[in-house]
Regions:
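Bacterial N-terminal signal peptides that target proteins for export
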Residues: 2-13
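N-terminal signal peptide c-region/cleavage motif recognized by signal peptidases
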Residues: 18-19
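Hydrophobic-ligand binding "helix-grip"
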Residues: 25-26, 37-39, 113-161
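Short beta-strand segments that buttress and anchor functional surface loops
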Residues: 48-49, 99-106, 131-133
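Hydrophobic pocket/interface hotspot
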Residues: 71-72, 81, 118, 167-169
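Hydrophobic ligand-binding cavity/cleft-lining segments
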Residues: 23-96
């Protein structure tokens, strides 16, 4: 009887886990092979975008005067994002590797939110933090937000020295909802600059 109860409980837990997550993955494995990019900004912070897998994919890159370890510690602290990335007003940790992120949008635009599952990977040359949108029973869609159902991104950190790191952030620039298409490139430029500045501000 005890064995049956344990097995039943284990099965129920497994089923809840399976049915609470549905992954819609955008892979950035081949993004570095893309040859055609549209340059938005070519300064200390470089920002560009391209179509990849049917989505507008954006990338911001900059060399920051901080160690890889210090930058990685900021990126992986998802619960602290509202204190780092100023457009994020709330995060909810749903599971060890799943988080619900809520964004404030400027002016008359509807706020956005997304639920992502993330993973970290480190090699001798780089540190990566990638994420993709998932569905989760504890974070149903809310009419106060436009759900970014295809949210995806990749942080890539490459050390240039012990105290300098090349930071690259690639993300799906799709904003959905009521966001005007003519303003997308301006929004990507703003986001690309803000993300780098906020990382630097958090470490100064």
């Amino acid at each position: 009887m005890v064995i049956k109860i344990i097995k039943t409980s284990y099965l129920a837990t497994a089923l809840v886990y399976i049915f609470s997550i549905a992954i819609a993955e955008i892979s950035f494995d081949k993004i570095d092979t893309v040859k055609i990019w549209n340059t938005i900004q070519n300064e200390n912070i470089q920002i560009r975008w391209t179509y990849y897998g049917g989505y507008p994919i954006c990338q911001t890159t900059s060399l920051l005067p901080f160690s890889l370890e210090s930058i990685a510690s900021v990126i992986e602290d998802v619960g602290n994002y509202p204190n780092i990335f100023k457009r994020i007003h709330k995060t909810e940790i749903l599971q060890n590797d799943i988080v619900h992120i809520m964004l404030n949008m400027p002016l008359f635009l509807s706020n956005r939110d997304y639920v992502i599952q993330y993973k970290k990977q480190k090699s001798q040359e780089t540190w990566e933090f990638t994420f993709n949108a998932v569905e989760h029973l504890d974070a149903p869609e809310n009419n106060k937000y436009v759900r970014l159902v295809n949210a995806a991104g990749r942080w890539q950190l490459t050390p240039e020295s012990k105290k300098t790191t090349l930071v690259s952030y690639t993300w799906n620039g799709e904003l959905l909802g009521d966001f005007p298409k003519f303003a997308l490139e301006r929004a990507w430029e703003t986001q690309g600059n803000e993300i780098i500045h906020w990382i630097a501000d958090a470490l100064e």
